Amino acid sequence: MRAEVWGCAVPRVGPHPVVILTVNRIAEPLSAVTVALVTGSAGPATTHVRIGPEAGLTKYDESYVNCADLHTVDQSNLRRRLGRLAPVEMRTVESNLRGVLGL
């Protein structure tokens, strides 16, 4: 699941694409996962990671993972798998998360 892009019913946000951040060995037995919202708006490179077409998103010309907009959602809120981040994109997301969270 980690690094996959899903359409998700995000509480208090509504339907939105998200990237799964929770590692697979933890996500499997849990009912909830941590996700980052995907947006069509560019932001600072320290928080936003541009993602390519293999992520499965077509609404905007460019899409970005917002590493500062994190949510924990029940796995039942995940509606449809759309795609997956490229390994280099996920490494950049991980780096940005360390900066955002001070890890």
Regions found by a protein language model. Give the residues of each.
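Conserved functional hotspots at enzyme active or ligand-binding sites that engage polyanionic ligands
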Residues: 1-103
